[in-house]
Each structure stands twice: as structure tokens, then as C-alpha cells.
Amino acid sequence: MFIINNNTFIAFANYYNSQKRNSVQSTVFKWSGGHFVKVQSLQTYGAWDVKSFQINGHTFLAFANYKSGRKFTTDSFIFKWNGNKFDLFQSIPTRGARALYPFVIRGQTFLGVANYFGDSQRFNTKSVVYQASGSRFVIYQEIPTQAASDITSFEYKGDTYLAVSTYSNGQKYNTNSALYKWM
């Protein structure tokens, strides 16, 4: 859930439709009259995750698109609220994106993306940290990962960390996840 101008919204990332196709509409609902009302559908491709965040008073929705058809190398989408609805702000290249997490360090907004695997369906890939730079997100850092399934950031004793969970290395599921310290 997120709030825009004292209105409560909720967004859902939809993975596939009743025909099991992953070119689907993910949905945004607004609280009105004691219940949520659908206000917008947004094109996504096997959306696995959605996060809302703000930059300088502007509200954004980011969707982690897992796959388009049989292709795991597909863009994920960042939408921006225009005062009435969400418009596509930017497409970012991802590889089987399973999760994303916006975070702020020293006033700079970043978006971490956990990539599961690319079109070769190999678990070794790179997850990406994007940085908001002017009117777009740019790649700040690529992190080697194996089937990354989630990503988050947290602060501890004045330091910022990025945690990336790993689902599998392609041979076993008892794997090590990674913790990175911001330098």
C-alpha cells in the first residue's frame, strides 16, 4: 500500500492470466467508499514483484518482470504518477527479475533488482543496482548472483547493507546468500 495526496492505493504484480500467458495487466486499486476500486491496469510481463517509492515528492511504481513468453531477458518497468494515473517512466533491462527494492543512501535513491537467470537459463547472472540520476535510472553496479530470489537494504550501526537471497546454484538448493556493505 502507498499514499498519494491522502489517498490510499495498492498495486498487484500479476504473473499470468487465465490462459497462463505472462503478457498481462497488473493492477492498481484506490481505497474509495470503504473498499478498493480498480483504477488502472498496467502492462507487465510475468510480473513477480512491485514496489512503490518516492523521489522528491513524485510517486513511482516499479514492477519486476520475470519473463515475456519464453524469454527471461526482458525489461522491467518503472511508472510515475502524473497526478491522475501512472505513466511509463522507464524500462530497465533485467534477466528473470524476481524482486526489487528501492532504498536511499545519503539522499540518493537506488533500486536494487534481484535477477534470477537469463535466456540461457543458467543460474549465474548479475543482479543490478540502479541509481536515480536526473530524469532516469542508470546502472550503478552489477553484482554476480546465482538465481537471486529477493533483495533488500538495511542500515546497522550507521552502515548500509544490501542483502541478496539465493534460491539455487543449479545443482542444489542449500546455497549461500550474499550480504554487501556499502562503501
What name fits each language-model region?
Residues 1-6, 51-57, 101-107, 152-158:
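Structural signature of eukaryotic scaffold interfaces centered on beta-propeller domains
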